[in-house]
Amino acid sequence: MDGTRTSLDIEEYSDTEVQKNQVLTLEEWQDKWVNGKTAFHQEQGHQLLKKHLDTFLKGKSGLRVFFPLCGKAVEMKWFADRGHSVVGVEISELGIQEFFTEQNLSYSEEPITEIPGTKVFKSSSGNISLYCCSIFDLPRTNIGKFDMIWDRGALVAINPGDRKCYADTMFSLLGKKFQYLLCVLSYDPTKHPGPPFYVPHAEIERLFGKICNIRCLEKVDAFEERHKSWGIDCLFEKLYLLTEK
């Protein structure tokens, strides 16, 4: 054995408090879109979701699917093309516009009456609605409950000090017999300040354990050449399924 860690023996890093005071403002996230600093976007979609999607959907149609901090995630069109209703929230209007443009979807925009100064973008087909606002303002819009949440790049982007508020927001959107698919990253948080932030299993239990059954479905090596600039040499991604207790 050469000592290389595999996707099945990932350790939890003990120094989980080192990132707790890290803060990125909404304006800084918007600047990332304006300046093209969106390496977190996956042009081909998320491979773990693609692998498990049909198993999760079980042939159902007409589900309501929520994408927190959606950006221009191509997976939104995957669900819409399968007959589901997609709702996303994203602070960057540019990111939302790029989604519709890159997916060749016509759309309209209208003000969100409950949140002055914000807009919702709706596909002409009517099954994709993307709200351009802070996720913490979203419950004011009465958008209803969801059958499924796809959380990739959301919890790991939320400032650590806001995670409890974020989890409570997610709980307010969950319908009966929900499936909450959650991706988190595992790396040494003493070497990279984030975002994306390190979210250990214990944190998921703390945030969601009282209401959800929590199961880790898969762990994969997600390290890429660009991650060397973070000062790390190891990065794993974990896919969790959260269901109603």
Swiss-Prot record:
Keyword annotations: Acetylation, Cytoplasm, Methyltransferase, Phosphoprotein, S-adenosyl-L-methionine, Transferase
EC number(s) recorded for this UniProt protein: 2.1.1.67
Gene Ontology cellular-component annotations: cytosol
pH dependence: Optimum pH is 7.5.
Outcome after substituting residue 240 to C: Allele TPMT*3B and allele TPMT*3C; reduced activity; protein shows enhanced degradation
InterPro entries referenced in this protein's UniProt entry, alphabetically: SAM-dependent_MTases_sf, Thiopurine_S-MeTrfase, TPMT
GO terms assigned for molecular function: S-adenosyl-L-methionine binding; thiopurine S-methyltransferase activity
Modified residues (N6-acetyllysine): 58
Outcome, altering residue 227 to Q: Allele TPMT*7; reduced activity
Residues the entry annotates as binding substrate: 40
GO BP: any one term: xenobiotic metabolic process
Regions that span the bilayer: none
Modified residues (Phosphoserine): 14
Documented activity regulation: Inhibited by S-adenosyl-L-homocysteine (SAH).
Keyword Acetylation: yes
Localization annotation: Cytoplasm
Binding site for S-adenosyl-L-methionine: 29-40, 69, 90, 134-135, 152
Catalytic activity from the UniProt record: S-adenosyl-L-methionine + a thiopurine = S-adenosyl-L-homocysteine + a thiopurine S-methylether; mercaptopurine + S-adenosyl-L-methionine = 6-methylthiopurine + S-adenosyl-L-homocysteine + H(+); 6-thioguanine + S-adenosyl-L-methionine = 6-methylthioguanine + S-adenosyl-L-homocysteine + H(+)
Function summary: Catalyzes the S-methylation of thiopurine drugs such as 6-mercaptopurine (also called mercaptopurine, 6-MP or its brand name Purinethol) and 6-thioguanine (also called tioguanine or 6-TG) using S-adenosyl-L-methionine as the methyl donor. TPMT activity modulates the cytotoxic effects of thiopurine prodrugs. A natural substrate for this enzyme has yet to be identified.
Subunit structure of this chain's protein: Monomer.
Protein family (similarity comment): Belongs to the class I-like SAM-binding methyltransferase superfamily. TPMT family.
Protein name: Thiopurine S-methyltransferase
Species for this entry: Homo sapiens
Organism placement in taxonomy: Eukaryota, Metazoa, Chordata, Craniata, Vertebrata
